[in-house]
Amino acid sequence: VTVTTTDAQGIYQMRVKRNAPFVFVSVPAEYEIPVENGMPKIYKKIAMGDNDVVQRSFKLERTGKKERFTLLALADVQIGRDDEVTMLDEEVLPLLIPYVQQELEAPVYGISLGDLVWDNMPFHSVYKEQIRKIGVPVFQVIGNHDHNKAITVDADADASFEAAFGPTYYSYNIGDCHFIVLDDVLYPGSSSYTADITDEQMAWLEQDL
């Protein structure tokens, strides 16, 4: 795990492990959170061999440090059936979207605090299509029900979440706040899991801070 900073021209170099799936940027407070198709996009996928050199760039827009912002917190959306998607689409979002757009002080940033789906991995993409309708960047946190319990290797159990939303741990900055997102679920398969944080994440966190 490696954390680095750019030089004055925004150039960075770093060594990464062969199996590292992503490189991501901890967006500085003076820059806007990059968005792609309505969702935060602070990461790039990487796939490389032992001696490969790859280039991944991030285009950030300097907007100045925000003195005030509103944080919208969601939790346990937990869609797992078509009727639950219908409820989210036709009952919940029609109430939430006007509230966010008309009542909350801009700029608004969201965070969804885990269990985006209910043990139904294909619904991650469905959830993504629904949540982007809110119209503000919403960061995602992985929950125990976002792990594929049919897979017995914890890192592989994250694959559906990562395909939809990117890394399971990362950080970003808004105003005077440094936000840290971690995956605190060790999921070896079946219905059981352990609440813990991997050594890899702790090593990254030490560098991040």
Where are these regions (language model features)?
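Short, solvent-exposed loop/turn elements at domain surfaces
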Residues: 4, 24, 79-85, 188-190
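Short Pro-Gly-centered beta-turn/loop motif in secreted/extracellular proteins
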Residues: 13-24
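Short, acidic Ser/Thr/Gly-rich low-complexity loop/linker segments typical of extracellular
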Residues: 1-11, 15
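N-terminal secretion/transport leader regions
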Residues: 25-26, 58
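Extended active-site neighborhood of metal-dependent phosphoesterases/phosphodiesterases
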Residues: 29-36, 42-46, 121-208
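N-terminal active-site segment of His-dependent metallophosphoesterases
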Residues: 35-124
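Residue-level detector of beta-strand structural context in well-folded domains
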Residues: 2, 56, 169-170
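Residue-level marker for the onset of beta-strands and adjacent loop->beta junctions
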Residues: 10, 54, 167-168
